[in-house]
Amino acid sequence: MKRIFLFLATNIAVLVVINIVLAVLGINSRGGAGSLLAYSAVVGFTGSIISLLMSKFIAKQSVGAEVIDTPRTEEEAWLLNTVEAQARQWNLKTPEVAIYHSPEPNAFATGASRNSSLIAVSTGLLDHMTRDEVEAVLAHEMAHVGNGDMVTLTLIQGVVNTFVVFLSRIIANLIARNNDGSQSQGTYFLVSMVFQILFGFLASLIVMWFSRQREYRADAGAAKLVGAPKMISALQRLKGNPVDLPEEMNAMGIAGDTRDSLLSTHPSLDNRIARLKSL
């Protein structure tokens, strides 16, 4: 739960900071509904797009991922060959492949586009899983890349952020208006920030729901690529190994929660396994 609230707080904080910067620069949302919507879109999409463009850099820095340029071991060579073969099946440029040091079994995919991506696995994943299970995890992450989930998630976050800013400003305009038609600037800013935080939390439920659906879709993509039994075996292995990632990377990891929640980025492992068994 702590990870989820930090994720929500980060997104809301980005919106607040952008609003403050625009206010300091003298760029405001005054005008008609069309101008306000355009302003809201700028605020709503800026943070999401910047995060997407910097996603590989942020991912590498946050977990200390080391990209495999030239394989030094048989295991690294196998990882590169497996990812390359899966990328060919998706008709994609081979993603960068990286390993990061962590005892917890996990993996994630990120990148600005389908042909500019990164797949990283933890040393814990390589230590705890069989080759078949690691292959399934790689296929799951490749499905995220092939489905364009990183870009889609960014667009959805940008859209909901836009309406969060738009609706909070509409309400602030109404509340801050004085009887003589003038407007209290301090009240307007304070009210808009309060409602931005409130609507930001509610809008995040939509993003979380989409994230859970993309996990089911990536599981199905992995099953199609390597077979459902391998993917089921990998998820069952994760049930016995609690995992963790930095907050900003949590939505991109393979592991999920042990139970379902509206604030979860992943469905429960039991539900994912049940969905795979029904394919």
UniProtKB/Swiss-Prot annotation:
| Broad EC category | hydrolase
Active-site residues annotated for this sequence: 141
Output one GO MF annotation: metalloendopeptidase activity
Name of the protein in its database record = Protease HtpX homolog
Q: What is its EC number?
A: 3.4.24.-
For this entry, list what GO says about its biological process.
Answer: proteolysis
Question: Where does this polypeptide localize?
Answer: Cell inner membrane
Requisite cofactors: Zn(2+)
Q: What is the lineage of its organism?
A: Bacteria, Pseudomonadati, Pseudomonadota, Betaproteobacteria, Neisseriales
Q: Which gene encodes it?
A: htpX
CDD domains reported for this sequence:
M48B_HtpX_like (cd07335)
**Cofactor notes:** Binds 1 zinc ion per subunit.
Record-annotated membrane-spanning stretches: 4-24, 34-54, 155-175, 189-209
Kindly give the membrane topology term recorded for this protein. Multi-pass membrane protein
Query: Which residues make up the binding site for Zn(2+)?
Result: 140, 144, 215
Pfam family membership, one: Peptidase_M48
**Keyword check for Cell inner membrane:** yes
